[in-house]
Amino acid sequence: MNSTLFSKVENHSIHYNASENSPLLAFENDDCHLPLAVIFTLALAYGAVIILGVSGNLALIIIILKQKEMRNVTNILIVNLSFSDLLVAVMCLPFTFVYTLMDHWVFGETMCKLNPFVQCVSITVSIFSLVLIAVERHQLIINPRGWRPNNRHAYIGITVIWVLAVASSLPFVIYQILTDEPFQNVSLAAFKDKYVCFDKFPSDSHRLSYTTLLLVLQYFGPLCFIFICYFKIYIRLKRRNNMMDKIRDSKYRSSETKRINIMLLSIVVAFAVCWLPLTIFNTVFDWNHQIIATCNHNLLFLLCHLTAMISTCVNPIFYGFLNKNFQRDLQFFFNFCDFRSRDDDYETIAMSTMHTDVSKTSLKQASPVAFKKISMNDNEKV
C-alpha cells in the first residue's frame, strides 16, 4: 500500500481542490476523490472495528488471566492471539486509515516504521498461535496417550513465535522510509513539507522475494497445516460419535461435540477469510500494480484492509457466542464484580489439558473416560 502512493504521485499531475476544504489529494480527475458518504461510512466501520477489537480482546485477556482455572494451554495461546490483535487495533488501524485517505504521512518517522512492522508481527503471531492450538488439539485427540503440551510448552512456543515474528518483520524497519520525494516537483503550497511513508527495498526482486516469503510463511503454509490437523480431528471425532451412539446420553455428547467442532474451525476459517482479500490485493499489486486503476486503489485497499482488520474482533466474538462461561464472566467484567470461582455455574466440560480434552478455545469435549470422572465430580470446572 505504501509503495503504491509513490508510483501514483510520480505518474499523475496533482492539484488541490480547495473548494472542498479537504486535505485529501486529488489527481487529474475529480473522480479520484472518495465521496464524503463513502469516507464517513468507512470511518464508522473502522471505528467500530477499533472499539470492538480493543474492548473485546482486552476483556478476553483480563477474564482469562483473572481465572486461574482457565490458564491452560489453549487459553494461554488465545491470550497471546488476543494481545497481538489488540496491538494491531491500537497501533495500526487508525494510522493506516488516515494515511490512505490523506495520501501523506503526518505521524512521524517512528510510526512510519512501526506501523507496518507491528502489523507484520501481529499476523505472524496470530497465525502461528493458531498453529500451536491446532498441534495441541491434534495431540489431545489423535494421540491422547502420547506427548501432550503443557503450560510450560505453551510459554516456550509463544516466545519462539514472537522471536520469529520480529525477525521476519525487521525488513519493514530497515527499508521503510519517510520522504518528501514524491512532492519535490509539485509547486503548490498545499503540498509543501508533505511526506509519504513507503518501503524502499534495494530492488524490485528483493521486495518480491520478501513479500512472496511472507505470503507462504504467514498465510498459505500455516493454513494448510492447520486444516490438515483439523481434518484429522474431524475424522476422529466422527468415529467417536459413532461409538457414542451406543452409550447413554449420547445425544448430549453429540450436541456438545457439534458445538466444539464449530469452535475448532471458526477462528481459523474467519482468519483465513478475513485476510484473503488483502492477501490477493497485495499479491496482485506486488507483481503487476498497473492492473489496479489509480483512482480505485485507495478505496479497494481500504475495503480489503478493513476486512482483514475484522479478524481482530474474531476471538471475542466466537469466544463469547460459543462459550457460556465467557458470557457469564463478561457480565461480571462489565459489572465490575470480582472474578470468583463459581463451580455451580460452570458447564461440566473438561477444559484443562490434564483431562484429555477435545476442543479449540474455551470449550473442550472430554473423552468417554473423562465424562465418567466428571459425572463423579459435579464441581469439575471449565
Swiss-Prot record:
Glycan-carrying positions: 2, 11, 17
GO CC, one annotated term: plasma membrane
InterPro entries recorded: GPCR_Rhodpsn (IPR000276), GPCR_Rhodpsn_7TM (IPR017452), NPY1_rcpt (IPR000351), NPY_rcpt (IPR000611)
GO BP of this protein: feeding behavior; glucose metabolic process; locomotory behavior; outflow tract morphogenesis; regulation of blood pressure; regulation of multicellular organism growth; sensory perception of pain
Topology, Extracellular side: 1-33, 97-115, 175-210, 281-298
Highest taxon listed in the record's lineage: Eukaryota
Lipid attachment points (S-palmitoyl cysteine): 337
Cellular compartment(s): Cell membrane
PROSITE patterns in the cross-refs: G_PROTEIN_RECEP_F1_1 (PS00237), G_PROTEIN_RECEP_F1_2 (PS50262)
Lipid bilayer topology: Multi-pass membrane protein
Disulfide pattern: 112-197
Tissue specificity comment: The alpha form is highly expressed in the brain, heart, kidney, spleen, skeletal muscle, and lung, whereas the beta receptor mRNA was not detected in these tissues. However, the beta form is expressed in mouse embryonic developmental stage (7 and 11 days), bone marrow cells and several hematopoietic cell lines.
Pfam families (alphabetical): 7tm_1
Family: Belongs to the G-protein coupled receptor 1 family.
Functional summary from the UniProt entry: Receptor for neuropeptide Y and peptide YY.
Protein known as: Neuropeptide Y receptor type 1
Organism, scientific name: Mus musculus (Mouse)
